Amino acid sequence: MAEKLPRPTDAELEILTVLWSRGPTTVREVHDRICARKPTQYTTVLKTLQIMAEKGLVRRDEKQRAHIYQTARPREWTQRQLAGDLLQRAFNGSARSLLLGALSAQKASKEELSELHRLLEEYEKGTR
């Protein structure tokens, strides 16, 4: 059975997004990126990263004076886990309802719809 990490909070997901885009990063760099979008205290980012390390969401490298944080799992792994959790909790396991909900919540581009068609055909054929 696949390892299941705790579901990240909104604040943790925001930090994970920074780490996925930047790679291994210091608390200061994460704080600067988040502050570019909204005012946040440095100590809040630090404490959140410490909690995330305890939960297994990130790893901390303590070899340097400024600790370096990186995600414990790739973005795709976390997205799959979150999608599966949402599928069960909000859509009663119905992939159809999840997809329709996503498409009605935000308009998809023609390119995205073409890609979805292609992926669905691959799943139907069993090649994905």
Regions inferred by a protein language model and the residue ranges of each:
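Amphipathic alpha-helical dimerization/coiled-coil segments
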Residues: 81-126
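Short beta-strand "wing" residues that participate in macromolecule-binding interfaces
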Residues: 59-60
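Short acidic, hydrophobic short linear motifs in intrinsically disordered regions
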Residues: 25-34
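Short, hydrophobic-biased segments on the C-terminal half of alpha helices
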Residues: 46-50
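Glycine-centered, phosphate/nucleic-acid-interacting loop/turn motifs that mediate DNA/RNA or nucleotide
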Residues: 56
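Short capping segments at the starts of secondary-structure elements
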Residues: 18-26
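Short, cationic-aromatic polyanion-contact patches
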Residues: 5-11, 63-82
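Short alpha-helical segments that sit at the start of domains
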Residues: 1-17, 126
